[in-house]
C-alpha cells in the first residue's frame, strides 16, 4: 500500500552537494595544485601569467568570484558530508549530527560568500 503522506527527505540535496564537491575536488583542484603549487614555483609556467595584478583582476571579475566560491564551498560540503557519514558508520552518534555538519557547512558557505563579495 502506498503511503498517502510520504516523509520528504532532505538527503538528495546533501548528496548533490557531496557529489558536486567530490567531482570538483577530483578534477579542478588537482589542476590548481599543479599550476600554483608545482609549475609556478619551478618556473615552468610563465611568471607574468599569474602575477599579482592578473590574479587580483581575475578574482574581482564575476567569473573569478564564482570560481573562487566553488573552489572553496564544494569541497567543503563534500568533506563535511563525508565526515557526517563516516561518524555514523563508526557508530559515533553526534547529537543532532545532521545539524552540526550541514549547519557548519551552511555557515561556512555564507562566510565564504561574504568574503568573496567583499574582494
Swiss-Prot record:
GO terms for biological process: fumarate metabolic process. CDD domains: QFR_TypeD_subunitD (cd00547). One of its GO terms (molecular function) is succinate dehydrogenase activity. It is found in: Cell inner membrane. Its main location: membrane. One of its GO terms (cellular component) is fumarate reductase complex. The keyword Cell membrane applies. It is a multi-pass membrane protein. SUPFAM superfamilies: Fumarate reductase respiratory complex transmembrane subunits. The chain crosses the membrane at residues 26-46, 55-75, 99-119. Keywords: Cell inner membrane, Cell membrane, Membrane, Transmembrane, Transmembrane helix. Part of an enzyme complex containing four subunits: a flavoprotein (FrdA), an iron-sulfur protein (FrdB), and two hydrophobic anchor proteins (FrdC and FrdD). Belongs to the FrdD family. Two distinct, membrane-bound, FAD-containing enzymes are responsible for the catalysis of fumarate and succinate interconversion; fumarate reductase is used in anaerobic growth, and succinate dehydrogenase is used in aerobic growth. Anchors the catalytic components of the fumarate reductase complex to the cell inner membrane, binds quinones. This is Fumarate reductase subunit D. The lineage of its organism: Bacteria, Pseudomonadati, Pseudomonadota, Gammaproteobacteria, Enterobacterales. The gene is frdD.
